[in-house]
Amino acid sequence: MKVGIIGAGTMGAGIAQAFAQTEGFTVALCDINNEFAANGKNKIAKGFEKRIAKGKMEQAEADAILGRITTGTKEICADCDLIIEAAIENMEIKKQTFKELDDICKPEAIFATNTSSLSITEIGAGLKRPMIGMHFFNPAPVMKLVEIIAGLNTPTDIVDKIKKVSEDIGKVPVQVEEAPGFVVNKILIPMINEAIGIYAEGIASVEGIDTAMKLGANHPIGPLALGDLIGLDVCLAIMDVLYHETGDSKYRAHTLLRKMVRGKQLGQKTGKGFYDYTK
C-alpha cells in the first residue's frame, strides 16, 4: 500500500516513519515545497542516526525504512491508496488541501485527516469521496493509539479498512464518535490548561506541578512538560475548538497559554516553553 502524508512537520514525519518501518507500505511525504518535505525525511534520518550510535538500530534497517519514503509536493500523491493529512490545525487550510487532492488522487484513494479536534464531517464537506479521522499521537512511531473517527457520511467499510491498516502498522485503533477533541484531547488538553492556571496562580513551580502529577497520579510525564512536547500552539488551538464548539467556560484557554503562543514560546519545537530546551 502506498500512503501519502500531507505535512512533513513533527506529526507528518512521525506518521510517515510509522508506516515506512512496516514492510508492505511505501510513503509519499509531502509539503508545500520540496525543501519542507525533504526536511521531514531528514528529521527521521537524524533520529535513526542517534539510535544507531546507541546500538539500538542497524544501519541496514534505517536505510530500508528511509528507502520506502519519497518526498515532494502533493502531486506525488496521485497514485496513493491512502492519504493522511497532517497539516496545521486550521479548518480552512485542511478543507482547501483536500479540495486540491480530490482532483489529483485516484478515485479509490481513501482520505483521512490527523486532526486532533476538528469536525471530520466539515473537513470532508463537498468532496467527491468520504472522509475519516485517523488521529495519531506524538511521537507517532512509538505511541500505540490511533483514534478512528467516522464523519456523518463515512461508510462502515472505510472505517473497517482504516482499523485494519492501523493494526497492520502495530497500532491499536479505538473508534470514537465525532465530537470536539474526540476522547483523549477532550480530557488531556484541559488538564494541561488547568496546570498552566495553577502555575500562573503561583500555587507551585513548573517542576513542582510536573513532579506532583508524576508521583501523585502515576503519570509518565508531567502536564507542563507534556504541553511542551505537544506544542503549546496545538494545545491552544484545541482549547479554542473545545470552547467555541461547546460554549462551556471550562474550556476557555488560560491567558498565560495564549500569551506564550503569541510570544512563540511553543515548547520543544521552538526551544523554549515551560522548560528551556536550548541548554
What is the meaning of each model-derived region?
Residues 1-50, 54:
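NAD(P)+-binding Rossmann beta1-loop-alpha1 motif at the extreme N-terminus of oxidoreductases
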Residues 12-15, 94, 116-120:
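Short glycine/serine/threonine-rich phosphate/pyrophosphate-binding segments
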Residues 23-24, 156, 167-178, 200-201, ...:
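NAD(P)-dependent Rossmann-like dehydrogenase/reductase catalytic/cofactor-binding core
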Residues 25, 139-149, 220-221, 240:
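Acidic/polar active-site rim loop that often engages polyanionic ligands
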Residues 28, 70-72, 84, 132, ...:
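Hydrophobic/aromatic beta-strand patches that form the interior of the parallel beta-sheet core
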Residues 36, 50-110, 118:
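Rossmann-like NAD(P)-binding element
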Residues 110-177, 182-185:
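Rossmann-fold dinucleotide-binding core
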